[in-house]
UniProtKB/Swiss-Prot annotation:
It comes from Mycolicibacterium gilvum (strain PYR-GCK). The keyword Zinc does not apply. It catalyses: adenosine(1518)/adenosine(1519) in 16S rRNA + 4 S-adenosyl-L-methionine = N(6)-dimethyladenosine(1518)/N(6)-dimethyladenosine(1519) in 16S rRNA + 4 S-adenosyl-L-homocysteine + 4 H(+). Residues 303-314 have a biased composition (Low complexity). Keywords: Cytoplasm, Methyltransferase, RNA-binding, rRNA processing, S-adenosyl-L-methionine, Transferase. Belongs to the class I-like SAM-binding methyltransferase superfamily. rRNA adenine N(6)-methyltransferase family. RsmA subfamily. This is Ribosomal RNA small subunit methyltransferase A.
Length: 314
């Protein structure tokens, strides 16, 4: 028996059979086009050696395609009804492949390594629009074992993730995701391949983690770099000198730190690359603690203080 992918009629029939209605609060839009899920899986390059983390499997369209590639899949689903139904759907549309599936009923934003017994090597998902960026950044930080990411997100989010410094779409997500790896666009996806049909187009984005990170990857270092990014984009039209003035303690000190990092103080924050942010922090190592963007002005004393089919709902 070979794997049968889900079509539009099957998706709607399946939802009706379990009396399920998509919830906007969970960003539930299900892919019903076999060519689209094959395209996503092919672009991800996953194979039988991979352990794939899938976020928001929904009714199982992408899950089936991933299993068809021979990969082991851990599917994390926040909706208990869908999490309970998924193994049944996979078993009905495949054969022994269901034994390579684990389903966890969890919130992806609080999902952690201790929730899994084996670390994933890839992340492939149709991310819910409402949590796409936070979920992506959280998983990249929490699971350094993830080497490849292929996600489908709202087209606007895809543009932001892949944007280059200085462009109109370049912002916090663009810079932060590049802390972990290289980012590439993989085209658009029409709303017509979803049920219910969303009002916007979707985009595919692939992230390949750096084989050897150019900078430290510990949590403390990452958080400090991210704070600098937040500070810069909270005031993106200001010069870097002015944007970082409160963090540095004064405009002159800000300029000194920027120059030490080979950054022109007159450059705007929206032109700084991830390399610039990292270098700024490293050149400011003597000042180690980076205050949060929203309380930087109140921290003048900081310098002186120098994760067979199973469903788990646990």
């Amino acid at each position: 028996m070979t794997i049968r992918l889900l079509g539009r009629t099957e998706i709607r029939h399946l939802a009706k059979s379990i009396d399920f209605r998509p919830r906007k609060s969970f960003g539930q839009n299900f892919v019903h086009d076999a060519n689209t899920v094959r395209r996503i899986v092919s672009a991800s390059s996953v194979n039988r050696s991979d352990h794939v983390l899938e976020v928001g499997p929904g009714l199982g369209s992408l899950t089936l395609a991933l299993l068809d590639r021979g990969a082991r899949v851990t599917a994390v689903e926040i909706d208990p009804v869908l999490a309970t139904q998924l193994p049944t759907t996979i078993a009905a549309h495949s054969h022994s492949e269901v034994n390579r599936l684990t389903v966890l009923n969890r919130d992806i934003l609080t999902f952690k390594q201790s929730d899994m017994t084996e670390m994933p090597t890839a992340l492939v998902a149709n991310l819910p629009y409402n949590v796409a960026v936070p979920a992506l950044l959280h998983l990249l930080a929490e699971f350094p074992s993830i080497r490849t990411v292929m996600v489908m997100v709202q087209a606007e989010v895809a543009e932001r993730l892949a944007a280059e410094p200085g462009g109109k779409d370049y912002g916090v997500p663009s810079a932060k995701v590049r802390f972990f790896g290289n980012v590439r666009r993989y085209g658009m996806v029409s709303p017509t391949v979803f049920w219910p049909i969303p009002r916007v187009y979707s985009g595919l984005v692939r992230i390949d983690r750096y084989e050897t990170s150019p900078w430290p990857t510990d949590t403390e270092f990452q958080e400090q770099v991210f704070e600098l990014i937040d500070i810069a984009f909270a005031q993106r039209r200001k010069t870097s000198r002015n944007a970082f003035a409160e963090w540095a303690g004064s405009g002159n000190e800000s300029a000194s730190r920027l120059l030490a990092a080979s950054i022109d103080p007159s450059r705007r924050g929206e032109t700084l690359s991830i390399n610039d942010f990292v270098r700024l922090l490293q050149r400011s190592a003597d000042w180690h603690t980076v205050p949060k963007a929203d309380d930087a002005g109140d921290d003048a004393d900081a310098q002186a203080k120098a994760d067979g089919a199973q469903v788990s709902t646990l």
